[in-house]
Amino acid sequence: MPNFEPNTISELEINISQCTKCDLAKTRNLTVPGDGNYNANIMLIGEAPGSNEDKTGKPFAGRAGSLLDELLMRSGIERSKVYITNMLKCRPPSNRDPQSSEISACQPYLDLQISLVDPSVIVTLGRFSFAKFFPQVTLSESRGIVRDWKGIKILPVYHPAAALYNPSLKPKLIQDFQKITTLLAEKDNTSLSNIQTQPNTQLNLFE
């Protein structure tokens, strides 16, 4: 990453496209920074790009992406209204699991994406993205359970690709995705309640 910190997602995506911080830079075709609404209330974080993503430069461009689109649609959410990214910005060879060194190399990029998008809800897709926020617990015991992380609601769900290999997981994904709109409504109601009940409270920008 350059010496200066990007101020926008667009600047950050340019930096990612030039990244050579790990060996994945030697085998990738395209970097896959992220895609969607830069001011989204909902951010989805997957694990790593696959072969389709490596060719297009867009996250969730293959079969898992088609299922993700269906899950969002069933929940009344337009894909264009969310921001989607991955833990890794380059495809691992043969679609293997991300390595810890690769996750560490990409972590500053993801941290900046979260900071710049500033979502109300983050949906973690799969165990690697969930472990970024709560490494002490497993996805299997936490799936669908909303947790708070620095004021952001974290909703852990199975990766859509898992449901392609194990169709019995799809109903659970559908159920979990339907919680997103409820979370946003709760967030809006809380904000409205705070305005109504604390009209004289000043926001401390340094908290």
For each of these PLM feature ranges, what is it?
Residues C22-N29, G62-L68, F130-L139:
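Short, mixed-charge, low-aromatic patches
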Residues P2, S10, S17, S75, ...:
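Glycine/proline-rich loop-helix segments at beta-alpha junctions forming the active-site rim
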Residues N29-V32, S66-L68, Q99-S104:
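Short N-terminal helix-initiation segments at or just after the protein's N-terminus
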